[in-house]
UniProtKB/Swiss-Prot annotation:
This is S-adenosylmethionine-dependent nucleotide dehydratase. Its cofactor is [4Fe-4S] cluster. Residues 6-216 form the Radical SAM core domain. Its EC number is 4.2.-.-. The keyword NADP does not apply. [4Fe-4S] cluster binds at C22, C26, C29. One of its GO terms (biological process) is defense response to virus. It catalyses: CTP + AH2 + S-adenosyl-L-methionine = 3'-deoxy-3',4'-didehydro-CTP + 5'-deoxyadenosine + L-methionine + A + H2O + H(+). Belongs to the radical SAM superfamily. Viperin family. Expression of pVip50 in E.coli (strain MG1655) confers resistance to phage P1; has no effect against T7. Catalyzes the conversion of cytosine triphosphate (CTP) to 3'-deoxy-3',4'-didehydro-CTP (ddhCTP), probably via a SAM-dependent radical mechanism. The modified nucleotide represses transcription from T7 RNA polymerase-directed genes (possibly by acting as chain terminators), strongly suggesting these nucleotides block viral polymerase transcription. How this protein allows bacteria to resist viruses that do not encode their own RNA polymerase (such as lambda, P1) is unknown. The lineage of its organism: Archaea, Methanobacteriati, Thermoplasmatota, Thermoplasmata. GO terms for molecular function: 4 iron, 4 sulfur cluster binding; lyase activity; metal ion binding. It comes from the Archaea.
């Protein structure tokens, strides 16, 4: 695959938020503003073709909760059939052994999301009603049995920044760990009281205590904004420059290019390209 050393730097991955609904109610979620409408897999062909011709290599299917999308299997087959590496970002609650078996050789990565290593925190945050952490370990085990790599996504929030995630990470055995600092975006999650934000010092303390884990990366708020190529469930280009979520038509993207809103240097700066 192409790496950061490529002479002309281009975005190598893109996130398609295929479905806006979710069965969890995480307090800090900045995707709850997504439209509840959605497109069929065939409607995504133009977007995927554009991304393929541009040089994108990996597609991340996200939500909402992508396993609620009624055409998930067909979408996975489409993306894989077009030659992309395929990742799915999920809360893991609806993933079964049967689905994993069907996706063996189709899905390359599964990203599993947590905010704390304390189940009481997860319940307070809105990530299910109990048993979330145990289920994440079980789903990770399923993935490994079927040859699917695991990425553990940790959102570092006010309830969890001081805790030690090492024992839980060892249980999950992920090939990659990504730690996000909880982010507030205008028009996304600024409509409710902020109970999740942490200070620079708190995030740095969390980083210092975990940075020697070999497969781990950290994304502060400034690393995140304007560094992701994203699409909403209706195929609109989703951008967050200036800490404000906005939606731009695909036609504008095709005419003006990804560089209009997304910073390729920030993309590479957050270690977005790795061995996938």
């Amino acid at each position: 695959m192409n790496t950061e050393t490529t002479s002309v730097r281009k975005f190598r991955s893109a996130n398609i938020h295929i479905y806006g609904k979710c069965n969890y109610r995480c307090e800090h979620c900045f995707d709850r503003c997504l439209t509840k409408n959605y497109m069929r897999p065939s409607d995504w062909v133009d977007t995927l073709t554009f991304l393929k011709e541009y040089g994108v290599e990996k597609i991340n299917l996200a939500g909402g909760e992508p396993t609620l999308y009624p055409f998930l299997d067909q979408m996975c087959y489409l993306v894989k059939g077009m030659g992309f590496k395929l990742s799915i970002v999920s809360n893991g609650s609806l993933i079964t052994e049967d689905w994993m078996a069907r996706m063996e050789g189709v899905v390359d990565w599964i990203g599993l999301s947590i905010d704390s290593i304390d189940e009481a925190d997860e319940i307070q945050i809105g990530r299910g009603r109990g048993g979330h952490l145990e289920n994440i370990v079980q789903v990770a085990d399923m993935a490994h049995r079927h040859g699917i790599k695991v990425k553990l996504n940790i959102t570092v929030v006010r309830r969890s920044w001081m805790k030690d995630f090492r024992p839980f990470i060892e249980k999950v055995r992920p090939e990659r760990v990504k730690c996000f600092r909880a982010l507030t975006l205008k028009n996304a999650n600024d409509d409710v009281p902020d109970t999740w934000s942490i200070t620079d010092k708190q995030f740095e303390d969390f980083r210092r205590r975990h940075e020697d884990i070999g497969c781990i990366v950290f994304e502060d708020n400034e690393d995140m904004v304007s560094s992701y190529v994203m699409f909403d469930p209706m195929g609109r280009w989703m951008v967050d420059s200036g800490y404000e979520k906005r939606f731009i038509s695909f036609e504008v993207l095709r005419r003006e290019g990804l560089d209009r809103e997304v910073d390729v240097e920030k993309y590479f700066g957050r270690n977005a390209v790795y061995e996938w």
